[in-house]
């Protein structure tokens, strides 16, 4: 019998945020994410939010409010479809409102990738596999 953790089907990273409202604005406006939830609801100063993108919210990130002295930036990787990776990079670069910390490049380890930084310093690396297996046209 397989170990019980072999049934895992999703991972949700949790980042810290110095302003949930600013985080919501950045991820929805600049990166195209959708809001999954905010806590407390109907509050002008939320302490938590869930943001997602992709089918069935497959790329989901939680953000918790953190005091500046306790803040530590995080990072996560998000796989995109074959055609969408380059198109998204061109969109982000062309608009010039998002800090690109790593330009789009094919890597020796078999990924084509680029990375962006949010307003708090959290880094998202968007990638696709060079050998195929990505959704979309290879």
Residue ranges of model-derived segments:
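Conserved short beta-strand elements that form part of the metal-binding/catalytic scaffold
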Residues: 34-75, 123-128
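Short beta-strand-to-loop elements that line the ligand-binding cleft
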Residues: 13-15, 36-40, 103-106
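Vicinal oxygen chelate
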Residues: 19-20, 78-123
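Positions that flank functional sites
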Residues: 42-43, 107-108, 136
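N-terminal beta-strand motif that seeds the catalytic metal site of vicinal oxygen chelate
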Residues: 1-25, 76-78, 127-138
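Conserved acetyl-CoA-binding loop of GNAT-fold acetyltransferases
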Residues: 29-36, 96-98
């Amino acid at each position: 019998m397989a170990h019980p953790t072999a049934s895992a089907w999703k991972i949700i990273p949790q980042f810290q945020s110095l302003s949930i409202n600013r985080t919501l604005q950045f991820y929805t406006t600049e990166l195209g994410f959708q809001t999954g939830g905010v806590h407390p609801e109907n509050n002008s100063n939320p302490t938590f939010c869930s943001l997602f993108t992709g089918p069935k919210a497959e790329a989901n990130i939680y953000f918790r409010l953190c005091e500046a002295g306790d803040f530590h930036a995080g990072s996560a990787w998000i796989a995109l479809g074959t055609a969408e990776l380059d198109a998204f990079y061109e969109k982000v670069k062309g608009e010039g409102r998002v800090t690109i910390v790593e330009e789009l490049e094919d890597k020796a380890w078999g990924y084509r990738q680029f990375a962006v930084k949010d307003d708090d310093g959290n880094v998202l690396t968007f990638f696709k596999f060079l050998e195929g297996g990505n959704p979309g046209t290879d």
